[in-house]
Amino acid sequence: AILKLLQDTSICDYLDIGTGTGRLLELLGPRVKNATGIDLSHEMLNMARTALEKSALENCQVRLGDMYDLPFEAASQDVVTLHQVLHYADDPASVIAEAARVTRQGGRLIVIDFAPHEEEGLRQDHAHRRLGFGDEDLATWFKQAAMQANAPVTLTGDPLSVVLWSGTKS
């Protein structure tokens, strides 16, 4: 779904916030000039480095970084993704604002996360702070961050559905 969303987008600089195992870097890396994944977990960064080495993606790198204080200049990225990360945030609006800060004019910010759900076990077992997000929440946060929201794409699942919310920097 993300490849389809970006099929007509030229990407020089790509940032994956909360990269985890680096899966999106592996997926988008062949299409971009420079890709960086950041994460607060040294363990996840090591897993991502290993995956990128196996994939021989020399244009991709990973580094330690905080989603609330990204180590990048303003307007430095063509595409920024938050893949299954926002539900860990205490302040999702601030994360969106910081991601938008580093997105270039005309660039894309893509949030991939759960639709609203009732799976309370994810709080205890996986430290989720939020049980999904509504379209209205993301639209509001995008607007506050000077992003023009695009129509969300829902991937229906049972019991969890995932939504791709995207915005273009105005």
Description of each model-found segment:
Residues 93-108:
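A short glycine-rich, Lys/Arg-flanked "PGG" loop and its adjoining helix->strand segment in the class I
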Residues 13-69:
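Class I SAM-dependent methyltransferase SAM/SAH-binding core
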Residues 90-93, 119:
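Short N-terminal helix/helix-N-cap motif within the alpha/beta-hydrolase-1
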Residues 108-165:
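C-terminal alpha-helical "lid/dimerization" subdomain adjacent to the S-adenosyl-L-methionine
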